Every structure is written in C-alpha cells, then in structure tokens.
Amino acid sequence: MERLELVVASSIGADLAMAFLTGTKQPIGHVFFDGGQFAQIAKGTGRVMTPFLYIAIKSLYWSKGGTLKKILWCDDDSIKLYFIAASENLTYTNLRRQILDSLEDKPFPSLPEELQKHIYFEFGSIEDHFKYRQAVIEAYPCGNYPVFEGYDHMQYQIRDPKGFAEMLTYIAAHDGMPKLPFIRK
C-alpha cells in the first residue's frame, strides 16, 4: 500500500486513529473525525465513572436495547442491534482500559501542519462534546471544523449512512466539504 486516501474515526475509536496518524510513515490523503472523541476528563473521574458506565452499557444487553434512549440521544432500530451486541461482549476490564487510555486530560498529540489542512473535525451543534471544539481548534489551527447544525453526536452517520458515505467520498475527491444545508463553518 502506497497511500491511505481517507481515515475515518468516530467516538473513542479516534484515539486509535490518532495513534496511527502520529506513528505512521504512510502518506495520508484526508482524515475525518467525529468530534465527540475529544472529551477529556481527569484520571480520577474516569476511575469513578467506570463502574456506572459499565452498568449503563450492560443494561443495553439486559434490556434488549430498552435503555438505549436513556444512554444515547437516539434509539433507532437501525443501530439498536449493534449496541446490544457490543454491550453483550463488553468486559469491565476493557471498558476501564479504554476510558483511562482514551479520555485522559492531556495535550493532544502534534500533527504536521500539512496534514492538519486535510483533517475534518466534525461536531454536532447540539452534542455535549461541542464544548471541546475550541480546544481542538487551538491544538490543530490548520484543520477544518464543520459544525452539523441541529445534529447530535454521530447523528448524521446513523440516520443517513448513505449521505454520510457520499460526504466522505466528496471530501476525498475534492479536498473539501460538500455543500450540505446543515453544515456551518
């Protein structure tokens, strides 16, 4: 493989993508991050919240998805089975490691200015994580920061996966965001 044209990362999986981006010698064309993964918490907070989050996530399996709306902003049938399966397979140890590794309040890793110009950090205007947008802008001043007006965390990709895929294709082909009615800069 000579080049990766597009790297896409959402939620906590973005930490893996960021580790890849900071460690690879592979040329990267474009990167799209869903903004929610940039939440940062103190280590102690992560330790305290892990058992509660574990029970909340496991409840998705125990209730056959009945608690999804209480945990996430939506309970679409299209995603319910995914969350049920994920919660069934979740272990406490894996969740603890993921929280402690992913949401730690530490400086964002540095990225080359040229790569930043081709990175898109999307935030939904009504998601809780929107408050972290300014910190990401300060860490990566050359990046692109579209706001999905009226959208919550990952809502566009869940509600319109085809439209989301077309948007990503456009980014890779045209080095920019398509004109979508809900996007503001």
Where are these regions (language model features)?
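Catalytic histidine-centered segment of alpha/beta-hydrolase-like enzymes
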Residues: Y151-A165
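Flexible "cap/lid" loop of the alpha/beta hydrolase fold
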Residues: T22-S59
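Catalytic histidine neighborhood in serine/cysteine hydrolases
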Residues: Y140-M154
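Gly/Ala-rich beta-loop-alpha elbow adjacent to hydrolase catalytic centers
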Residues: V8-A17
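Conserved serine/cysteine hydrolase catalytic core
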Residues: R97-A139, Y156
